[in-house]
A protein has these predicted regions:
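Donor-nucleotide binding loops and adjacent catalytic segments primarily
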Residues: 1-74
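Residues at alpha-helix caps and immediate loop-helix transition turns in enzyme cores, especially N-
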Residues: 15-16, 106, 156
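Hydrophobic, well-ordered secondary-structure elements that form the walls
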Residues: 20, 31, 68, 76, ...
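A donor-sugar binding/catalytic signature common to diverse glycosyltransferases
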Residues: 61-108
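C-terminal amphipathic helix plus adjacent low-complexity
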Residues: 126-169
Length: 169
């Protein structure tokens, strides 16, 4: 399963979504695209249907991201901190396409840690190449798993509360 979401704010990206459909159409993957409410879903569904693709596209305004990430093989994301943290928690490697400076910082760090690939070419070929690299190179999955394991070692909410109390005591 490939999951694509550009977040809830800056997601009016019809041309980019069409490029993703073209890039992934020859794959055997199920592709879930969460586009928000600014994009004409019927237009994208029609575009996907007319492309004679092998991939199965599911285009929705919003999805239960946690549920989708538990099944995803790769996540193309805008690199919001929550989205990236959730993906890495579930050991999902990333194709990263940040839109803001904060998101670029998150993408830079994930790239540095080897758990994702920074998408610099938003053309059909660029998107296709990025997905191929992340899917074929097991390093991304391995590093996403290592980050997930480090999250587990942090101790969760209970440990966070203990630390806060310790600092302010």
């Amino acid at each position: 399963l490939i999951y694509i979401s550009m977040g809830t704010v800056n997601n009016d990206m019809t041309t980019f979504y069409k490029n993703c459909i073209d890039a992934l159409g020859s794959s055997d993957y199920q592709v879930v695209i969460s586009v928000g409410n600014q994009v004409d879903i019927k237009l994208l569904e029609g575009y996907a249907a007319s492309s004679n693709s092998k991939a199965e596209f599911c285009i929705l305004p919003y999805v239960d991201q946690i549920a989708v990430l538990q099944k995803a093989d790769v996540f193309l994301t805008h690199c919001g901190m929550n989205s990236v943290s959730e993906a890495l928690y579930f050991k999902v490697p990333l194709v990263m396409y940040p839109q803001t400076n904060e998101q670029k910082g998150v993408a830079f760090r994930v790239d540095e840690l080897g758990a994702g690939l920074y998408l610099t070419d938003e053309t059909v070929m660029g998107i296709q190449t990025a997905f191929h690299e992340v899917i074929q190179n097991e390093m991304y999955q391995k590093h996403a798993g290592e980050i997930s394991d480090s999250f587990a070692r942090c101790g969760g909410c209970k440990k966070a509360v203990e630390k806060i109390v310790e600092v302010f005591a």
